[in-house]
């Protein structure tokens, strides 16, 4: 990347010279504009046609910057002085000009505030501009003047308030700080003061160092000559922004010396104009100007090994780490000198922080290391916390067994009249900083939302009423007692800047724990690493596959009885006063289901300490040091809040004090791996503990009545704890650092089904380390066309990532090792098994920027002479894309299903019906798919002829080859593909058969008309939902299907015992034939972040609502999981298309939608209202994609049109949905015109409905924020 940046031409290559003379009228024929008095370069105004007397060179162009007149630099001069230089010069005039663009435009302030390497052309030009400025202006400073200095000559001495006024008014061209004082360079006046009238001294050849020109700090220089020994004096006397000293701007971390020698004197050698074509010559000329002491300048320190410093097109410095092939804005040399925030001065920022002045959001701060933003100055925040830490605590009389820093939880109530304390009301107006306070709480259903801190100078601080600990009772007459943290955040976010909100607060409740208590020490957050270290589970690093992880960890959980006696002295957690203990609460605990609720787990984690620490905080507890808060989720893989720390680097710390554990963690070297053994679950329950698992599974249709029920096999791969995120009272649902429950269920179900006692279709083992697989590493270099292969799969969580077509003559094709159908396991060492397609594409984009990629793929080998089944496909998963005429599976054969036959006869099941069959041939082009969707209903008993013809056409894509041939209809049953019977063939094999067909496929079908009888099933688009009986035991995997030689069809086989009956949707598979584009990543981007345009991931302002508390920076607060029915996640998932018919209830259809063409996204189900028709129907889920509404396709449909269609259907609505992942995609940027309304359920938990633009709104609902007019909450 750095090479490509260096090849970009510098602006100096566009500098051109024009040689002109005066015309017969004695004029030059062009107008001069700009000038330093206007904060601009001098530039050409109107160039009068025919009035310029050219002698040689290029022609003058209006708006170009004027750099030199007869080799005299004029940048930084006023227009008056530039004209004086021109007037003094004799004909011909040699003018050097350059076109505006890139880093050079007419704005002097912008150019002076950029950072350049010493000796570069830009650095020299900055010097010239500054020296020219000081001919006409005197720098200002807030420091007291020293003996011998003349006010108005050496400096203009002003107060801080006056300096801030100058800065705010735009009167300063440069500003910065040095030694706690502000320095600035004011714009020069258009007409010079008599003291500085040196027009006659600006002659060709004169330089800023020549005799007669005003020198900066002449009196200071003369005084220092006798005492230049002390480096402190030398450092102190070096000016800051006057051209001879140090400039530290908010964008600069370098101490740049501005052509001053060690003595502080201005060098006496001539100061030439920059040589624009040969910048390297200037490096020799600047040797004498470098400081004599390396520690005075970071530039003199060598970069670490294999690091490189480079410049963007705008001249900004960034650093390249060739070891990891990453880039960073942060100077690695400064990391060694980094100070903690509390030790920084108030006018400096800690290492890795940046101050942003945004015209919309105001001033905020960016932490580049932890990738977060906040409004409060980090130095002031750290000092404030330190001051509060040092204050004497008077509330230490806690209960004997209470952990230090944690207070007794107050009695919660949803009734405002039962609150004990003083009520007060206030009205706050939202500013660019938000409301100016942070909140805490709402992580559990019965927890108050309280004010955590009031941001200085924010609206709340200026109002003066709000205090830390105040309970938020009402927001605009809406009672929020019992609302979740995320819900209240959304309420505040919905308030536009400039509008006010009415708050009712209750004072008298302390915070649930003291966040400033010294016992809750913070181990600072970890610097973001490109590849987080793998979790060590039960003493082992990364497992080869998820299957291996499940199978191994399910048998290796230690029993609590193995712990030493002294570690068992633990009191029951809150809500567990009866002495019972909850089960482990983290997804990483994959203990056997029969192990009971008192199982505990020891885990070994490996965490790398970053420049800012580990990224978690610890707090004292009766049993030892516990993890109080995870500040950096990525940096602490596998760690969970409430974990008890047992060992650190093989040193037992259970009996050590809080301070001793903190010291051990501090002593761990930065960048090294630290091994932690933590204890989770069992008697060592954290202070915030969910309800017992059995309580949560009651009345939810649980597949078992007890956690230790003998009916559940011991090799059940998914313990109930894995489904924690769907529990109504869970506080950590959809936590990004934990596996997605939907994904876990899919994989677990596949394992469960594969272990049933049914003859397997093949004999390969589930452990991927067996001989039926081989893994190989493939290293590819990127060509102009990309890496030369396509990626398939990953369209739903849990689907394998597969190599699709290998492009002819591409990088992968030339390498020869990559085959279609290979399962992708690692990309540059990062595991991708079970990841989404988008995630893998992002990794490939990143690899493309580096120009190379290391892939690890897994390939099935022949098993005992028989072809292996399709590569890497988990049972029950569906290949949803045909992307290429080339085969996706190179080693597969269909011979184990049915013998190929060119004349496949109808099966026995429908011969008596005398149904007419026909062959349909579909041809497609190279760049398109066949355009039809197949529904397979192998597991659903049907009547009549369809009992033995389970596959049918479910959908035909408009304009596709299937549509153009006009011979296929929705509902047609498919007997054979290319002459091969598919009646008993699993769905995934049919998909592969069609993929291998090339550019044409022949389908033998029974037309839908032949099936239109009372005994036949309706077409897929007109079926109403059917109640089915499903369970993991009842639903057979394709692995368990009998071979076609079996006389009976799969549906005729007796089903295993069914301990559970769940209402679900059709158990069918569907696959759509369409194209997948090749991966062609863009490598033209420079570093990952752009100072001018902060990316959305972490550089956005902290939020337009109010200043978010640190917990929001680090912890992903979960949505209210009560709206996600538990049964949804236990039903067999098929990621299918399906139809939902609903009757309108008293309050509407009971669902809300997100998306639309105006938001550049598809339409999705956003919320399901409790007890509404949608949730009672049981088929619709949050995150489902809406394909059709009342028969109309939603492709390119606006949000408003979708609302209109739903309303126009009257009392009924029919939706064609595609099963989603349970999570709704976010908007790229939520438009401010979205309207919101809120409805509280009986628990007080609000449901938000994003319904579209205000033009669709109806009358406002009482009790709702009076912001944009709210839409009706009914569909």
UniProtKB/Swiss-Prot annotation:
Pfam families: Guanylate_kin, MAGI_u1, PDZ, WW. GO terms for cellular component: bicellular tight junction; centriole; centrosome; ciliary base; cytoplasm; dendrite; late endosome; nucleus. Residues 893-907 have a biased composition (Low complexity). The modification Phosphotyrosine is found at residues 361, 826. One of its GO terms (molecular function) is beta-1 adrenergic receptor binding. Its main location: cytoplasm. Expressed throughout the retina except in the nuclear layers and the photoreceptor outer segments (at protein level). Highest retinal expression is observed in the outer plexiform layer, the outer limiting membrane and the inner segment of photoreceptor cells (at protein level). Expressed in brain. Interacts (via its WW domains) with DRPLA. Interacts (via its second PDZ domain) with PTEN (via unphosphorylated C-terminus); this interaction diminishes the degradation rate of PTEN. Interacts (via guanylate kinase domain) with DLGAP1. Interacts (via the PDZ domains) with GRIN2A, GRID2 and NLGN1. Interacts with CTNND2, CTNNB1 and MAGUIN-1. Interacts with ACVR2A, SMAD2 and SMAD3. Part of a complex consisting of MAGI2/ARIP1, ACVR2A, ACVR1B and SMAD3. May interact with HTR2A. Interacts with RAPGEF2. Identified in a complex with ACTN4, CASK, IQGAP1, NPHS1, SPTAN1 and SPTBN1. Interacts with DDN. Seems to act as a scaffold molecule at synaptic junctions by assembling neurotransmitter receptors and cell adhesion proteins. Plays a role in nerve growth factor (NGF)-induced recruitment of RAPGEF2 to late endosomes and neurite outgrowth. May play a role in regulating activin-mediated signaling in neuronal cells. Enhances the ability of PTEN to suppress AKT1 activation. Plays a role in receptor-mediated clathrin-dependent endocytosis which is required for ciliogenesis. Residues 280-295, 1067-1083 have a biased composition (Basic and acidic residues). PANTHER family: MEMBRANE ASSOCIATED GUANYLATE KINASE-RELATED, MEMBRANE-ASSOCIATED GUANYLATE KINASE, WW AND PDZ DOMAIN-CONTAINING PROTEIN 2. The modification Phosphoserine is found at residues 685, 883-884, 1013. GO terms for biological process: cellular response to nerve growth factor stimulus; clathrin-dependent endocytosis; negative regulation of activin receptor signaling pathway; negative regulation of cell migration; negative regulation of cell population proliferation; negative regulation of phosphatidylinositol 3-kinase/protein kinase B signal transduction; nerve growth factor signaling pathway; neuroligin clustering involved in postsynaptic membrane assembly. This is Membrane-associated guanylate kinase, WW and PDZ domain-containing protein 2. Transmembrane segments: none annotated. It is a peripheral membrane protein. Residues 301-380 are annotated as: Interaction with DDN. Residues 699-708, 1010-1040 have a biased composition (Polar residues). It comes from the Eukaryota. Belongs to the MAGUK family. Gene3D superfamilies: 2.20.70.10, 2.30.42.10, Guanylate Kinase phosphate binding domain. InterPro entries: GK/Ca_channel_bsu (IPR008145), Guanylate_kin-like_dom (IPR008144), Guanylate_kinase_CS (IPR020590), P-loop_NTPase (IPR027417), PDZ (IPR001478), PDZ_sf (IPR036034), WW_dom (IPR001202), WW_dom_sf (IPR036020). The gene is Magi2. Keywords: Cell membrane, Cell projection, Cytoplasm, Cytoskeleton, Endocytosis, Endosome, Membrane, Neurogenesis, Phosphoprotein, Repeat, Synapse, Synaptosome. It comes from Mus musculus. It is found in: Cytoplasm; Late endosome; Synapse, Synaptosome; Cell membrane. SMART domains: GuKc, PDZ, WW. Residues 17-101, 425-509, 604-682, 777-859, 919-1009, 1139-1221 form the PDZ domain.
């Amino acid at each position: 990347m750095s090479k490509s940046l260096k090849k970009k031409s510098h602006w100096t290559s566009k500098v051109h010279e024009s040689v002109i003379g005066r015309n017969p009228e004695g004029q030059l024929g062009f107008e001069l504009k700009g000038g330093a008095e206007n904060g601009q370069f001098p530039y050409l105004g109107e160039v009068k046609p025919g009035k310029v007397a050219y002698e040689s060179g290029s022609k003058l162009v209006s708006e170009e910057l004027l750099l030199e007149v007869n080799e005299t630099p004029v940048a930084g001069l006023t227009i008056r002085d530039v004209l004086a230089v021109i007037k003094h010069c004799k004909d011909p005039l040699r003018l050097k000009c350059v076109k505006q663009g890139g880093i050079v435009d007419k704005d002097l302030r912008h150019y002076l505030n950029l950072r350049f390497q010493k000796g570069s052309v830009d650095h020299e030009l900055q010097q010239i501009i500054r020296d020219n400025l000081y001919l006409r202006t005197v720098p200002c400073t807030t420091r007291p003047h020293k003996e011998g200095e003349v006010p108005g000559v050496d400096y203009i001495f002003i107060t801080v308030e006056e300096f801030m006024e100058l800065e705010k008014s735009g009167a300063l061209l440069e500003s910065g700080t040095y030694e706690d004082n502000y320095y600035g360079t004011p714009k020069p006046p258009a007409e010079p003061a008599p003291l500085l009238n040196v027009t006659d001294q600006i002659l060709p050849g004169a330089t800023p160092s020549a005799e007669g020109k005003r020198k900066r700090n002449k009196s200071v220089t003369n005084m220092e000559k006798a005492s230049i020994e002390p480096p402190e004096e030398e450092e102190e006397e070096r000016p800051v922004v006057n051209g001879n000293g140090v400039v530290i701007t908010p964008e600069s971390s370098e101490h740049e010396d501005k052509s001053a020698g060690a003595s502080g004197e201005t060098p006496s050698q001539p100061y030439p104009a920059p040589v624009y074509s040969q910048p390297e010559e200037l490096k020799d000329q600047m040797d004498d100007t470098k400081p004599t002491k390396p520690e005075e300048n970071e530039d003199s320190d060598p970069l670490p090994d294999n690091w490189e410093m480079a410049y963007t097109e705008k001249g900004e410095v960034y650093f390249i780490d060739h070891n990891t092939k990453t880039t960073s804005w942060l100077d690695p040399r400064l990391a060694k000198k980094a100070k903690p925030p509390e030790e920084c001065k108030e006018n400096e920022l800690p290492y890795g922080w940046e101050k942003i002045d945004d015209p919309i959001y105001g001033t905020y701060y960016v932490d580049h290391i932890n990738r977060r933003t906040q409004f409060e100055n980090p130095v002031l925040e750290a000092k404030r916390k330190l001051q509060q830490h040092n204050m004497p605590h008077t509330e230490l009389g806690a209960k004997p067994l209470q952990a230090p820093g944690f207070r007794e939880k107050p009695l919660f109530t949803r009734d405002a009249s039962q609150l004990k304390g003083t009520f007060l009301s206030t009205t706050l107006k939202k500013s660019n900083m938000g409301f100016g306070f942070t909140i805490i709480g709402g992580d559990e259903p019965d927890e108050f939302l309280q004010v955590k801190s009031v941001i200085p100078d924010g609206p709340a601080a200026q109002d003066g009423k709000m205090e830390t600990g105040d309970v938020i009772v009402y927001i605009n007459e809406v009672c929020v007692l019992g609302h979740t943290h995320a819900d209240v955040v959304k309420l505040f976010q919905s308030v536009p800047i400039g509008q006010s909100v009415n708050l009712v607060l209750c004072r008298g409740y302390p915070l649930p724990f003291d966040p400033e208590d010294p016992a809750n020490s913070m181990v600072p957050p970890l610097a973001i690493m490109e590849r987080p270290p793998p979790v060590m589970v039960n003493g082992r690093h990364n497992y080869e596959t998820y299957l291996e992880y499940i199978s191994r960890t399910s048998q290796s959980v230690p029993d609590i009885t193995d712990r030493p006696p002294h570690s068992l002295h633990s009191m029951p957690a809150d809500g567990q006063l009866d002495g019972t203990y909850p089960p482990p609460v983290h997804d990483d605990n994959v203990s056997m289901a029969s192990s009971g609720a008192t199982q505990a787990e020891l885990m070994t984690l490996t965490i790398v300490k970053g420049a800012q620490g580990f990224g978690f905080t610890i707090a004292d507890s009766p049993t030892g040091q516990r993890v109080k808060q995870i500040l950096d989720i990525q940096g602490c893989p596998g760690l969970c809040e409430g974990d008890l720390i047992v060992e650190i680097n093989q040193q037992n710390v259970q009996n050590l004090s809080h301070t001793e554990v903190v010291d051990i963690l501090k002593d761990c070297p930065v960048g090294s791996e630290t091994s932690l053994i933590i204890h989770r679950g069992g008697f060592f329950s954290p202070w915030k503990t969910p309800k017992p698992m059995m309580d949560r599974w009651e009345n939810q249709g649980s597949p078992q009545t007890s956690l230790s029920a003998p009916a559940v096999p011991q090799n059940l791969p998914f313990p109930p704890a894995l489904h924690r995120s769907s529990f109504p009272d869970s506080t950590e649902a959809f936590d990004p650092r934990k596996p997605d429950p939907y994904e876990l269920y899919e994989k677990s179900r596949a394992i469960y089904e594969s272990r049933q006692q049914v003859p397997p279709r093949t004999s390969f083992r589930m452990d991927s380390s067996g001989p039926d697989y081989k893994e190989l590493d493939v290293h590819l270099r990127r060509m102009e066309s990309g890496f030369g292969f396509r990626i398939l799969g990953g369209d739903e969580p849990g689907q394998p990532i597969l190599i699709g077509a290998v492009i002819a003559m591409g990088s992968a094709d030339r390498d020869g090792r990559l085959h279609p159908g290979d399962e992708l396991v690692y990309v540059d060492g990062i595991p991708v098994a079970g990841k989404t397609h988008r995630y893998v594409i992002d990794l490939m984009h990143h690899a493309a920027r580096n120009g190379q990629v290391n892939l690890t793929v897994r390939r099935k080998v022949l098993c005992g002479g028989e072809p292996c089944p399709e590569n890497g496909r988990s049972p029950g998963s569906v290949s949803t894309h045909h992307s290429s005429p080339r085969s996706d599976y190179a080693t597969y054969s269909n011979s184990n299903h049915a013998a190929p036959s060119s004349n496949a006869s109808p099966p026995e099941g429908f011969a008596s019906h005398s149904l007419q069959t026909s062959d349909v041939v579909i041809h497609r082009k190279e760049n398109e798919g066949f355009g039809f969707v197949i529904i397979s209903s192998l597991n659903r008993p049907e009547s009549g002829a369809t009992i033995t013809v389970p596959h049918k056409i479910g959908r035909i894509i408009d304009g596709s080859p299937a549509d153009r041939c006009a011979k296929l209809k929705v509902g047609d049953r498919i007997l054979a593909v290319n002459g091969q019977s598919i009646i008993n063939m699993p769905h995934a094999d049919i998909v592969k058969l069609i993929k291998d067909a090339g550019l044409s496929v022949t389908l033998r079908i029974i037309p839908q008309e032949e099936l239109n009888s009372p005994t036949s099933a309706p077409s897929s688009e007109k079926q109403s939902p059917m109640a089915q009986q499903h369970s993991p035991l009842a639903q057979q995997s394709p692995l368990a299907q009998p071979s076609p030689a079996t006389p009976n069809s799969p549906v005729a086989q007796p089903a295993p015992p069914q301990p559970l009956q769940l209402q679900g949707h059709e158990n069918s598979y569907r696959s759509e034939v369409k194209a997948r584009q090749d991966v062609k990543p863009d490598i033209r981007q420079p570093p990952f972040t752009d100072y001018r345009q902060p990316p959305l991931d972490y550089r956005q302002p902290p939020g337009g609502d109010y200043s978010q508390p640190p917990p929001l920076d680090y912890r992903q607060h979960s949505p209210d999981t009560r709206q996600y029915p538990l049964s949804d996640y236990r039903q067999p998932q098929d990621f299918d298309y399906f139809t939902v018919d609903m009757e309108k209830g008293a309050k509407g259809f009971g669902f809300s939608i997100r998306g639309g063409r105006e938001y550049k996204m598809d339409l999705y189900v956003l919320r399901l209202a409790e007890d509404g028709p949608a949730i009672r129907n049981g088929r619709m889920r949050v995150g489902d994609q809406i394909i059709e509404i009342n028969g109309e396709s939603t492709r390119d449909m606006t949000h408003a049109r979708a609302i209109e269609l739903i309303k126009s259907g009257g009392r009924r609505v029919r939706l064609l949905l595609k099963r989603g992942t349970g999570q709704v995609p976010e908007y790229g940027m939520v438009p401010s015109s979205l309207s919101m309304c809120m409805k509280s359920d009986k628990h007080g938990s609000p449901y938000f409905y994003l319904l579209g633009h205000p033009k669709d709104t109806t009358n406002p609902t009482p009790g709702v924020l009076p912001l944009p007019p709210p839409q009706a909450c009914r569909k």
